[in-house]
């Protein structure tokens, strides 16, 4: 009986040793496939590689590089954010030109207009022009808000689209050109917002005109 048990033990050991030289089956070595949820969690922002990719920034919008460190896109509609970005960017593009032009001596006739860009604010308040500017800006905001509300309700309007299309980019066949122009506008908008902030800061710090270098 003892010899039989020993024989079985030796046979089992030999089988185990032999199995080490046999190639494992596919089923045994098949790696676990990552779930889509794990893949999404692993995705990183293109602009901020140390932060996760915002769920609402999928790259479909022009200039979308996943930059949202504060997380605004998680609780504010992305179309509203793009509308605000384009509006502020367009205003700053005009402001950069107007700010520099004023300090280069281009202004309306009259002594009341012969002031620097920085001094123009106080001059407008003193003459009563500032309330008029506020009134007109408020009127334009009220009118444009109708289109924004309709957009958020699903009208299909693209953010920042007010029907101004002098190059006929909306016509069939111009899709690629339209995408190119949309990207360029966003890039210029962002640059103008930074540039205007820098120009105002430099003008105040150095109390000088263009190019605001002291």
Regions inferred by a protein language model and the residue ranges of each:
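Alpha-helical transmembrane segments and their helix-helix packing motifs
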Residues: 3-7, 14-16, 21-214
